């Protein structure tokens, strides 16, 4: 039962424009096992709470109650924003006696001992209120008593507004790049980009940047919007932006050492208190030879207000320097042209189509949804959508079939095994609770460039590396891909793929090889922990400003697992301890179950050349055969089939291929005579391989 008490304003303390306190003294009952609202009117303030002029600085409560742990105390703004001041704190102790809440107090209410008197940091940061909302109107103090037998009294409560609002930070210089955004009178919203001006200052490593410096990296127009899904409720917002010219057209520019483009992300690591979980995952993928978003730590100012530490990074996009697949044009609807390139994703977005195979272990009829990302759902042509859907359907059907391990008709005909291996390692090391089922991207190039489905780029790892308190996301044991049996009722399930892949000897052997390679290099704990330490050193000064702006250390922010680190150093120490234990579990569960044969042919191919390994199968062939290539360098390739007279009877000229494994399917040879043939594969650097084939 919820009760409502409305009280007339008892007192107002006014000190010109510096501070204004509103308080009431209701002496009202706090009923047993009930949620009760107590309200207070606020008026006469400016119409926006912000960090520049006026905002909420503190809250105060005076409660008599025999058992504080029974209470959850929430402050609610006129616009409906809710902040928990206290939640089940104090154990069996009693009373909040003239208890004040300031974000700047080093001792959080979680750490206090009842009776609570004096000043504490609230359970959640008050600075979240200072988000341009109107402070005038009805404020609510909601008190939930969760048990029976213990009642109490709300004696008084109040709110202090001032020109020193919670979260206000004095900011003049940084060792990180400084981004300054000015929107004029416009408000940044989600879904539609507004026009703004952006300046970027970066004097180089080791040289301090001052907010008064002349912008030397970028100064010009942008379009900017709030982005994200669950993160939109956080005090620190994420932004997507486009660099534009004076006419509003997109313009490609190189920013902070990244290749020229116009689509960028300002990632806000609000609920990742290490500030670096995404950066770690993306760097891991790049060290495995995959493209992943390049990242630069920076500090952001919007309309004169300090916003904290951000990560400036590339957006996933078809581009020669990002997802390097052929850009699909509207006219590309037939033949080779329709075969690529595509980016699709598995996420919460409206589905372009659903998986033909339901997820394993789900209990509520959930379906895996695929969404067209590039071309997007608006721009993609019907024949293009039909093609990529049919291709993914064929991949799933082959993987789900009894012959799924067959190299010619199984899933390997459609998918790059090595890309799935690399993706598996990133997700399993990080125990990403969203892994495989959300923010999961796949891409496919044209058949002249390999044409297989590849998983990636990796994206969205803020809930990884022990940063989720649900569905076993915080455990160092267990497989992340086995999410469905743990949380079978969750709407967003993991595709069946991974349950099948881990039973395939080809996948297991490649996993063993790559994991062993990485554990002996980048994922050696000395090396990996050095990257964590280097990132921490880089943001060392900035993190103090960040956590003054967002007073959340030592508190719960969804979905942080307990215990909540009270310092930045403790957060990173906890993360490293977790990673060490996680690697030990993976060592015990990957290393015993694979065989690594780096070169499977007897060819004398120099590892410095492009071609590392080439094979063709089946041999003899009848209707078709597969050319499998493992390449070491970016190059284009000629694949030529000769008869015994030296005549070229079939030929494929590939586009530029990056280091990876590729399969090319030669399926137009059913009509050629039986006999002996020579297959020659050659690269730009002169390396080549010739294989004898027999047509039976």
Predicted segments with their positions:
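Bacterial Sec-dependent N-terminal signal peptides
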Residues: 1-21, 602-603, 696
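C-terminal outer-membrane/trafficking sorting elements
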Residues: 15-18, 607-617, 621-696
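Loop and turn regions of beta-sandwich accessory domains that flank beta-strands and are enriched
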Residues: 20-168
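Low-complexity, Pro/Thr/Ser/Gly/Ala-rich linker/spacer regions in secreted
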Residues: 20-23, 162-174, 592-610
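Short beta-strand/loop motifs in extracellular/secreted proteins, especially
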Residues: 69-71, 81-83, 196, 237-239, ...
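Residue-level detector of buried hydrophobic side-chain packing
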Residues: 73-75, 141, 159, 181, ...
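Phosphate-handling architecture centered on phosphoinositide signaling
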Residues: 157, 161-420, 528, 541, ...
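Middle-to-C-terminal accessory/interaction subdomains
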Residues: 174-177, 185-189, 193-197, 228-230, ...
């Amino acid at each position: 039962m919820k009760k409502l008490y409305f009280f007339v304003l008892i007192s107002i303390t006014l000190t010109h424009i510096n501070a204004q306190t509103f308080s009431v003294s209701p002496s009202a009952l706090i009923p047993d096992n009930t949620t009760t609202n107590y309200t207070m009117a606020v008026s006469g303030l400016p119409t926006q709470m912000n960090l520049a002029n006026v905002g909420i600085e503190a809250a105060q409560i005076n409660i008599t109650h025999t058992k504080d742990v029974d209470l959850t105390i929430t402050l609610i703004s006129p616009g409906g924003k809710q902040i928990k001041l206290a939640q089940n704190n104090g154990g069996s102790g009693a009373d909040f006696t003239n208890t004040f809440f300031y974000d700047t107090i080093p001792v959080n209410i979680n750490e206090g001992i009842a009776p609570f008197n004096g000043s504490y940091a609230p359970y959640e940061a008050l600075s979240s209120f200072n988000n341009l909302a109107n402070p005038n109107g009805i404020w609510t103090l909601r008190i939930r008593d969760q048990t029976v037998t213990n009642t109490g009294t709300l004696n008084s409560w109040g709110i202090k507004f001032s020109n020193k609002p919670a979260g206000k930070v004095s900011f003049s210089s940084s060792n990180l790049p400084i981004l300054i955004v000015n929107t004029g009178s416009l408000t940044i919203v989600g879904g539609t980009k507004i026009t703004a001006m952006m300046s970027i200052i970066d004097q180089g490593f080791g040289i301090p940047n001052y907010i008064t410096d002349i912008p030397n990296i970028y100064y010009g127009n942008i379009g900017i919007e709030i982005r994200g899904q669950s993160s939109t409720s956080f005090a620190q917002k994420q932004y997507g932006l486009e660099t534009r010219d004076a006419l509003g057209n997109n313009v490609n520019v190189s920013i902070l050492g990244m290749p020229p483009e116009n689509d960028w992300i300002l990632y806000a690591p609000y609920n990742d208190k290490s500030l670096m979980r995404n950066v770690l995952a993306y760097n891991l993928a790049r060290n495995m030879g995959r493209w992943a978003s390049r990242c630069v730590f920076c500090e952001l100012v919007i309309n004169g207000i300090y916003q904290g530490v951000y990560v400036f990074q590339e957006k996933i996009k078809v581009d020669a320097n990002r997802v390097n697949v052929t850009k699909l044009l509207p006219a590309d609807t037939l033949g080779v042209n329709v075969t690529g390139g595509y980016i699709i994703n598995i996420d919460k977005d409206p589905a372009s189509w659903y998986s033909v195979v339901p997820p394993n272990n789900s209990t509520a009829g959930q379906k895996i949804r695929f969404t067209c990302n590039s071309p997007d759902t608006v721009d993609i042509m019907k024949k293009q959508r039909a093609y990529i859907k049919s291709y993914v359907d064929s991949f799933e059907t082959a993987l789900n079939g009894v012959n799924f391990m067959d190299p010619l008709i199984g899933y390997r005909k459609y998918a790059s095994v090595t890309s799935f291996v690399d993706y598996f390692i990133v997700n399993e090391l990080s125990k990403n609770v969203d892994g495989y089922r959300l923010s999961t991207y796949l891409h496919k190039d044209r058949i002249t460039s390999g044409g297989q489905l590849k998983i990636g780029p990796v994206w969205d790892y803020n809930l990884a590396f022990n940063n989720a308190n649900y569905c076993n996301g915080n455990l160092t044991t267990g497989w992340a891909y086995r999410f469905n049996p743990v949380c079978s009722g969750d709407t967003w399930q993991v595709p069946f793929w991974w349950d099948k892949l881990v039973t395939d000897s080809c996948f297991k052997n490649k996993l063993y090889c790559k994991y062993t390679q990485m554990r002996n290099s980048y994922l050696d704990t000395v090396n990996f922990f050095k990257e964590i330490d280097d990132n921490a050193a880089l943001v060392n000064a900035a993190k103090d400003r960040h956590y003054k702006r967002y007073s959340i250390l030592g508190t719960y922010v969804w979905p942080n697992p307990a215990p909540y680190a009270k310092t930045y150093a403790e957060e990173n120490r906890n993360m490293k301890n977790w990673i060490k234990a996680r690697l030990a579990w993976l060592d015990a569960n990957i290393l015993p179950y694979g065989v690594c044969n780096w070169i499977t042919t007897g060819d004398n191919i120099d590892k410095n050349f492009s071609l590392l390994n080439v094979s063709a199968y089946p041999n003899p062939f009848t209707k078709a055969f597969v050319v499998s290539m493992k390449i070491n360098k970016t190059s284009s390739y000629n694949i030529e089939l000769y008869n015994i007279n030296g005549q070229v009877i079939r030929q494929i000229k590939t586009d530029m291929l990056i280091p990876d494994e590729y399969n090319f399917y030669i399926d137009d040879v059913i009509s050629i005579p039986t006999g002996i043939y020579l297959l020659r594969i050659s690269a730009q650097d002169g390396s080549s391989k010739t294989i004898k084939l027999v047509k039976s």
